[in-house]
């Protein structure tokens, strides 16, 4: 699907790698960060996003929220400055969610540094530097490394310059080869690189493959449906549900007016929903059983703002 490429950012894997600079997308990185946090006495913690797209768009937001709760639990929150540094214009890619999630980070005293296009990491002075020469100091830097598609896709000639397969966003057919269909992170369709996207896309795929084999027009259209829970710390969470045309909006999910989950709301019920989803993943999704959530996104329960 997609892989992290820390070597794509100048200075990232220099002398501070896995000492004061970490990713959490690998076991090695997560374990090294855990050990560093255990004896850390405080300072400037920076979470940086240098490039789009990347696996699970809300993961960095979850990280800073959970880090904030972790340091509060340890009684040292007042000793830690947390910054969320992103090339986006706000906390998220879409305006309504960006405002809500940005306000949530502000409530937690987490600084959002936006429109920061990272050029390199200065290991000597412990700074990240943007192409327009802005600088952000850090004591500990956590980063979402540049994501790229598989080397196999590059070798096959199927991919673009990021090794993702150019794909029709509705039919999921390769734009280059009629006998190839693509779902999940391997495609370049303009939606999240997340498990929910692969799941919803898979539900329309069979119809189109059969139609292509029989020379018929492909009837099924994927709408880019994605949803995900966002852990926010303190036993609470948020939830977003959106597609190509509709950004994440507030409301209730999956039942209009009832929920029990709240869209773009920070609630304990959403946290319980994420915990429940672990069981759903192992006992329903992997066994091919149907979920009571349609592949196409619905506006039912959503409030336009």
Where are these regions (language model features)?
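Extended hydrophobic secondary-structure segments that form protein cores and membrane-embedded regions
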Residues: 47-48, 81-89, 225-232
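A Rossmann-like FAD-binding core segment of flavoenzymes
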Residues: 72-164, 217-219
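C-terminal auxiliary extensions adjacent to catalytic cores
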Residues: 239-305
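Residues forming the flavin
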Residues: 46-48, 55-56, 63-66, 70-71, ...
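FAD-site-proximal beta/loop scaffold in flavoenzymes
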Residues: 3-8, 14-41, 135-200, 210-211
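Rossmann-like NAD(P)H-binding beta-loop-alpha module
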Residues: 26-80
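FAD-binding beta-loop-beta segment adjacent to the flavin cofactor pocket
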Residues: 163-181, 232-253
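A conserved FAD-binding loop/helix module that cradles the flavin
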Residues: 183-232, 238-241
């Amino acid at each position: 699907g997609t892989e992290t490429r820390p070597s794509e950012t100048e200075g990232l894997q220099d002398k501070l790698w896995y000492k004061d600079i970490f990713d959490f997308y690998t076991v090695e990185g997560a374990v090294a960060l855990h050990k560093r946090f255990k004896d850390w006495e405080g300072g400037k913690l920076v979470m940086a996003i240098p490039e789009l797209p990347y696996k699970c768009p809300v993961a960095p937001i979850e990280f800073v929220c959970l880090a904030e709760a972790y340091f509060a639990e340890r009684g040292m929150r007042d000793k830690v400055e947390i910054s969320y540094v992103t090339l986006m214009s706000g906390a998220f890619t879409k305006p309504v969610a960006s405002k809500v999630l940005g306000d949530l980070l502000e409530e937690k005293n987490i600084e959002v540094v936006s429109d920061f296009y990272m050029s390199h990491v200065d290991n000597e002075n412990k700074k990240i530097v943007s192409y327009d020469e802005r600088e952000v100091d850090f004591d500990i830097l956590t980063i979402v490394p540049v994501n790229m598609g598989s080397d196999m896709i590059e070798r096959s000639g199927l991919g673009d310059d990021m090794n993702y397969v150019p794909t029709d966003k509705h039919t999921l057919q390769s734009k280059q080869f009629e006998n190839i269909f693509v779902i999940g992170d391997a495609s370049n369709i303009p939606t999240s690189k997340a498990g929910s996207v692969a799941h919803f896309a898979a539900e329309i795929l069979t119809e189109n493959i059969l139609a292509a084999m029989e020379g018929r027009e492909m009837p099924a259209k994927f709408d880019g449906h994605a949803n995900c829970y966002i852990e926010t710390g303190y036993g609470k969470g948020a939830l977003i549900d959106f597609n190509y045309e509709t950004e994440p909006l507030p409301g209730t999910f999956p039942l209009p007016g009832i929920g029990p989950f709240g869209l773009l709301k920070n609630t304990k019920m959403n946290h319980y929903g994420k915990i429940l989803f672990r069981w759903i993943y192992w006992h329903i999704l992997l066994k091919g059983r149907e979920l009571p959530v349609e592949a196409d996104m619905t506006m039912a329960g959503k409030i336009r703002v």
